């Protein structure tokens, strides 16, 4: 494992030429974290859409609860409770959990949708971490993550795309799009469904890898108003 880690570290260091230096990468990631850490908790209303070949889930209204640093829960209005049960996460804060126990490595500059983004790779220092590497595409001017690609041991590689609006100053997106390979399927943390209505997943026997898509569009946030820990129980 140490040999693999060293190889990855050397590789991403070669990508840094012409972009950020390591100290700048650390400072940029700190700015992103500091912005996210302004949010101690929130309750948000939104709409959840899914496009997964083996699961039939209707578009629905949801309430999202978050409490710093890593408590996250989604509740649907139609009786289906969506609770954290491990796996991947649609919550950006989860990438920075662990008190900064990672190495930030600069990996160049890219242009995406006409916007220049700094690329930073986060390598967890703990060999017990499920995350192998996260690649962040950061809007340096506004300290916002526009895209994140994360490779895990348990659930393969997944991608998060984020769009921002009036809550950008808090680092909170108006829209999150979560893309993953259904062959390595494990629902994101906060999106493991309890089928309280009796509806079960519809599975597809096709073994060809397919992309799953989960989209959350936020209507509003109530930020730093206090949320009881009991909300995240059960």
Predicted regions and their residues:
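Bacterial N-terminal signal peptides
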Residues: 7-16
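Sequence/structural signature of outer-membrane beta-barrel proteins
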Residues: 51-53, 183
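Gly/Pro-enriched, hydrophobic low-complexity segments
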Residues: 116-230
